[in-house]
From Swiss-Prot:
Keywords: Coiled coil, Isopeptide bond, Nucleus, Phosphoprotein, Transcription, Transcription regulation, Ubl conjugation, Wnt signaling pathway. This is RNA polymerase II-associated factor 1 homolog. Component of the PAF1 complex (PAF1C) which has multiple functions during transcription by RNA polymerase II and is implicated in regulation of development and maintenance of embryonic stem cell pluripotency. PAF1C associates with RNA polymerase II through interaction with POLR2A CTD non-phosphorylated and 'Ser-2'- and 'Ser-5'-phosphorylated forms and is involved in transcriptional elongation, acting both independently and synergistically with TCEA1 and in cooperation with the DSIF complex and HTATSF1. PAF1C is required for transcription of Hox and Wnt target genes. It is found in: Nucleus. Belongs to the PAF1 family. It comes from Mus musculus (Mouse). The gene is Paf1.
Amino acid sequence: MAPTIQTQAQREDGHRPNSHRTLPERSGVVCRVKYCNSLPDIPFDPKFITYPFDQNRFVQYKATSLEKQHKHDLLTEPDLGVTIDLINPDTYRIDPNVLLDPADEKLLEEEIQAPTSSKRSQQHAKVVPWMRKTEYISTEFNRYGISNEKPEVKIGVSVKQQFTEEEIYKDRDSQITAIEKTFEDAQKSISQHYSKPRVTPVEVMPVFPDFKMWINPCAQVIFDSDPAPKDTSGAAALEMMSQAMIRGMMDEEGNQFVAYFLPVEETLKKRKRDQEEEMDYAPDDVYDYKIAREYNWNVKNKASKGYEENYFFIFREGDGVYYNELETRVRLSKRRAKAGVQSGTNALLVVKHRDMNEKELEAQEARKAQLENHEPEEEEEEEMEAEEKEAGGSDEEQEKGSSSEKEGSEDEHSGSESDREEGDRDEASDKSGSGEDESSEDEARAARDKEEIFGSDADSEDDADSDDEDRGQAHRGSDNDSDSGSDGGGQRSRSQSRSRSRSASPFPSGSEHSAQEDGSEAAASDSSEADSDSD
């Protein structure tokens, strides 16, 4: 039933007889009015503020065609309440020494919530779902706790929750399953759009990396305005911009900028001829470009902070779709001309093509290897090393086990005493032979090491003589023991330095090698004798 409001006059009329009742006032509306309440006037003018909430939060309202077609009169002042003085510029100059009104200072203060660390406030901050929330409890709760259930506070919470609910693959197994799932999803046939059910695919093409063009690094150049020349438009401007080049330059004051070069008419003819003859360039021709604009630049690449990966797609008919990487992003903004100074830059860029050198070809091969060759990650390398160690440890354990089994079998299944003695003799002879071979190999290695460290005999003797002469001049008043000790130490240090410089060169023959080994042993024995004398 529709609500009604009874006034004092209506109450008085209710006690009068029906004959004395007055007729209700006639409404200005043709149709019957269901609600007789008159709406109050709007207390303030429209502010043109964007309504941040859902319009259907309280009621789902749908405007009629009459309301949509009606144009409301908006009566405002011609200057919108802002008086602008175009004559005196000092009108809007702010005096920094003026003190603000206390009311304005409060508006400029930052709202800092006081820390609620008291026990009573923590108790009031608890939400008890089974308790009925009366007005007294709600006001008490809002006094101490911070309520986040208001829709005004929840703006943007759904967007934040979408980011937090995304699956983050932290462990290795989840990453592997996610990668395998992509291959499985790629095999499924596409029947409809992922977000638009009524949209169906017309053609399905596979997507692959562009192995053909990946060797060439690509960059995305973004202009702040159309770089086409003003006197040309349409297809001619597009053809000219497709042949354009950018180069870094420096002016007379040492300021760097980017120059935008466009081809001259003769260059356009040469490029058109090359395209018709299906060749990249003519080896002997020279292509001229004239400067058109000057720009300031901002470059971002993989080494820059906040870099985001960017890719572009190439559609090849009958083959598929290929994607390539945009390593660099260059933003160009027009360079401001100095006041009263006209840009006198009239540069001409002369281009002549050549074949790629070895360094450039190596760089292309390195980029191609990024796609073809799989470099193992650190985790894979660590796992491989651990597996190798485990395999090596198992081999050692097997060898130890086999040796112990052999010993046990020999003890258990021993024959006669003569057979045992003969076997022992054979084993001793084999061990002695192998020991001699090992000792000879060890001696040869030791000789090589000594030669590398101490050098040959002749060099060590010359070094010793020179060291003796030098020390004799420097330490004439010292004792014999100190002289002998310094002689041995100096001989060792000089022979070590000389051998380091010599060890890099290979030996020409085996005879010289053996002679130098004998000399190194002699040098080592001399140094050891000198050490014993000093001791």
